[in-house]
Amino acid sequence: MTISKWPACERPREKLLESGAAALSDAELLAVLLRVGAAGKSAVDLARELLHRFGSLTALFAAQGQALAGVRGMGAAKFAQVQAIPELARRALAESLRLPSGFDSPDSVRSYLRLTLAPLQHEVFMCLFLDPGNRMVASEELFRGTLTRTSVYPREVARQALAHNAAGIIVAHNHPRGTTAPSQSDIHLTRELARTLDLIDVRLLDHFIVAGHEIRSLAESCERLPGL
């Protein structure tokens, strides 16, 4: 049965308009975005199939075209729709971090880093450059590595900080198939970054590690890094 023949109170779009987006399940929200399904398959059926196949929204949004092409009803247009969601979310969060009150909420920073780093299957080291008012002036991926490691050069981080006239920096990297527990090299790198940046009067505010849905602040959790 097509969604148009469902009772109005059960149709995802009408349910959203009546009760708000929070009242919908993940599959129902995804169905609103997809709009239509395929022959013999409603948009809700298609959404449920996608969530079942990929296991989570995070994995679905990180999926590439070839993986999605294996699902009947997922053409280029729907792939583009699915890919647009996390990118819009990242841009909205980045926009909020550029406001005067952006860094008043640590959750916004964590959410932005999760959205950016969690889906990646290789290690990435990124920097958020802040002005004296703690507004983000730039967000850049500086180094990219393999599944298990990446090489980071503190002098290049310092050079970019000067280029952006930054007063402070937040750095982050991901552990694609690991945990957020910092390695000895993570601790050593953070110390080296703090020392190098101190020479140019730029403060390293924090170093975050992202692994899946988890995120760890080394400034909050690591006793071996006093002063961050």
Curated annotation (Swiss-Prot):
Record organism: Cupriavidus taiwanensis (strain DSM 17343 / BCRC 17206 / CCUG 44338 / CIP 107171 / LMG 19424 / R1)
The protein, known as: UPF0758 protein RALTA_A2508
Motif (JAMM motif): 173-186
A GO term, aspect molecular function: metal ion binding
InterPro entries attached to this UniProt entry: MPN, RadC_JAB, RuvA_2-like, UPF0758, UPF0758_N
Record keyword Protease present: yes
Domain of life: Bacteria
GO BP terms in the entry: proteolysis
Residues binding Zn(2+), per UniProt: H173, H175, D186
Keywords linked to the UniProt accession: Hydrolase, Metal-binding, Metalloprotease, Protease, Zinc
Domain MPN: from-to ranges: 102-224
Family listed: Belongs to the UPF0758 family.
